[in-house]
Amino acid sequence: MKTFTIGKKKIVLKEEWMVGFITTWIVGLLAHAYRFFNFLPIWDSIYNFTGVGSTYTLGRWFLGYAGLITSMFDLPWVNGAFSLFYISIVVILLTEMFEIKNKGMIVLCAAIFVSFPTVVSSFAYMYTADAYLLAFLLATLAVYLTWCVKKWGTIAGMVCLAFAMGIYQAYATVAIVLVLLYIIRQFVIEKLDFLEAVRKDLKYLGMLVGGAVLYAVILKITLIRYNITLPGYQGIGALGIMSLGQYKAALQKTLYHFRLILGMEHGVEKRVYSILNAAVLLLIGLIFIYLLIRNQVYKKKLSMLASIAAVCLIPVGAYFINFTSPDVQYYTLMEMAVCLIYLLMIIMLLQLDWKTWISKILKGCGIFVLCGLVYYNVINCNIAYFNMNLSYHKSISIAEDVLQRIEQMDEFQNQHDKVVIMGDYNCATENLQIMMPS
């Protein structure tokens, strides 16, 4: 713990904070330096060199303002650095909230978060990545303030959640899953009575509902102010109560996408990522049962049922947007809440010691699997950026060749001629070398 003074105020820096902060940057650079120090545009980037994409029209009334922090330009290093900073603060807040003191576990937490597939997907849209990860921070801060500030924490949490949703609505799911994790911790680790936990947790429900209502109110004012309506894109214009059949379909979509992002859309496959994530889910289940028995939570029926329900509801919470409109389609960009399952595993691993054989096996396997995931994710990040680089250069080469051939035609008049392109150019990335235009 280090202390320094700014004016008359003493600032305390805990070692745990510094470990989380530094790890985020080290692993973040290992995973994403390829992206930060190269210009790798995608389709959206071409017309968003100066901007953050659609804002008010998609209900993202704070996105434009959040993008101003790093200017309105697509700046890979600047936007990437701010993104890493936001993630590192998230790690610090969560280590405080869930009382993670073990430095090794903090390293794993930071490394998993910063290399998660949603972060890679966000960096594909680098012109708005920093704003999206600011939404991640605000959603986390909403739960943290509700937890630690007694008097005005819930209200402050509502404001943070509303602004997180004002950047990207999908980040509300981060707050939902964090509340579920805290409920699990209360029952399984702190061993609170059911009614006592309910009294304590009502403020989190108030924060979630209040934040959503505040977001909706500001959205309504924004729509009136600019005289616009929400489009049908992603079901944004059709939010509301659905039919029972639609809720069933939403649950099916949720379970499919939950398996998909973990690499298990067709069950456990012979792929490293699929096997590692299957091991994570298995270990979470085994450690959860072990803690229920060891801490005698099973003697408190309501507490046990509530903790089981909270675990089962994690996928629903992570994909809650599915249950607000039948037209929602989830993308990796929207799935940051799923990475919190690894936080749940870390929280439970901290309750295991190295004394009994079963505890040793569970803890050792858990640490090994998480280390494997970090390694795999870092490699996978670089592979993703490598493919982005190939795709970009391939596209540029094809476009230049087409343009040259057009300009060589006798009918070509000037640069203002319009060109109609019909058909498809067969140039899959894996065939890059043999499909280059000649």
What are these regions (language model features)?
Residues 30, 35, 201-280, 322:
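Membrane-lumen/periplasm interface segments of specific transmembrane helices
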Residues 54-77, 81-85:
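Short hydrophobic/aromatic helix or loop-helix immediately within or flanking a transmembrane segment
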Residues 56, 60, 83-86, 104-147, ...:
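Membrane-interface micro-motifs in multi-pass membrane enzymes
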Residues 139-154, 188-192:
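Membrane-interface transmembrane helices that cradle and orient dolichyl/undecaprenyl
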Residues 153-169, 174, 180:
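Membrane-interface alpha helices of multi-pass inner-membrane proteins
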Residues 154, 277, 351-380:
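Signature aromatic-anchored transmembrane alpha helix within multi-pass, membrane-resident enzymes
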Residues 175-209:
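Perimembrane helix-loop-helix junctions
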